[in-house]
A protein has these predicted regions:
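Sec-dependent, cleavable N-terminal signal peptides
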Residues: 1-12
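Extracellular ligand-binding interfaces
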Residues: 11-92, 97, 101-233
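C-terminal outer-membrane/trafficking sorting elements
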Residues: 237-279
């Protein structure tokens, strides 16, 4: 996949504005209808004050919002957080709405609008995360909701590093048994680091954890942004689904190419050759 440069989507839609004192017992809840016109790739922004040193989490349906960081630690001069809508995130927002959680800060505004291109059904997370000295990006486990790992060959971690001489560790937990790969076992390019899933049971690896962690050390070069976590589908899975959908107008298939009568659960589906996220 070739990631396109960030682009501005004209217009912004205000979702909520006011002053809400957020703490763990006083969540700010936004109804699903407020996100009816939101699109994949749109940027969702939560503005706040008095949050320096605090932690903010974005939830939906009582759990973490897919496609987001596990927690946002707020810097002294920071007045907002922004996330970019993956298909899974959008599905949750439009069905369950948004819950802004955290410890002792004032939420002031929520809106969505200008965003990024290059986000599709295989995008688990997209955004900008600064990698410096042993920085760790933690994305929520349910960012992979609906994924059939039997049809995924690798995970690509895109960045703006423009080089390969940095340290990267991909982990599900700290300590023994949590490391999935590093720069010595992954394919390193100037555009991305790729973790092959050959020999890795991702379903089992994620079963008893709540996040996937990407840790980097810039080494001798400059710090850089991580920009996207993308799944790589096996060619056989894509070809198999395409062949079936060419013959079946509005038939519904799972991402693995199995025909179903209707959509019974959340996940990725294909109708008439086009992928979409079932709610």
């Amino acid at each position: 996949m070739c990631l396109m440069a960030t682009t501005v989507i004209a217009g912004a839609t205000d979702v909520w504005e006011g002053e809400h004192a957020v703490d763990w017992s006083n969540t700010l809840k936004i109804e699903a209808a407020k996100f009816a016109d939101m699109k994949v790739g749109d940027k969702l922004v939560v503005e706040f004050k008095d949050a320096a040193g605090k932690v903010i989490e974005l939830h939906s349906d009582g759990g973490m919002l897919p496609g987001t960081r596990f927690a946002h630690s707020i810097f002294p001069d920071q007045s907002n957080i922004e996330v970019f809508a993956t298909p899974a995130m959008l599905s949750y927002l439009q069905e369950h709405g948004l819950e802004v959680c955290g410890m002792d800060f004032i939420a002031t505004k929520i809106w969505y609008g200008d965003g990024k291109e290059g986000i599709d059904d295989l995008t688990a997370w997209s955004g900008f995360f600064w990698m410096d000295e042993w920085s760790t990006l933690e994305i929520t486990k349910n960012s992979f909701v609906g994924v059939d790992w039997d049809n995924i060959s690798a995970i690509r971690f895109y960045s703006e590093a423009g080089r390969t001489d940095y340290i990267i560790n991909v982990m599900t937990k700290w300590g023994d048994g949590g490391k999935l790969g590093d720069q010595t076992t992954m394919t390193m390019t100037d555009e991305y680091a790729e973790l092959s899933l050959e020999g890795i049971d991702m379903e089992a690896a994620l079963a008893d954890v709540d996040r996937l962690m990407i840790q980097c050390n810039k080494e001798g070069g400059a710090p850089f942004n991580f920009t996207q976590v993308e799944l790589v589908a096996k060619p056989s899975a894509v070809q198999g689904v395409s062949a079936k959908t060419e013959k079946a107008d509005n038939s519904i298939y799972t991402i693995s190419g199995v025909k179903v009568d209707n959509i019974g659960q959340k996940g990725l589906y294909i109708v008439n050759g086009k992928k979409f996220v079932g709610k």
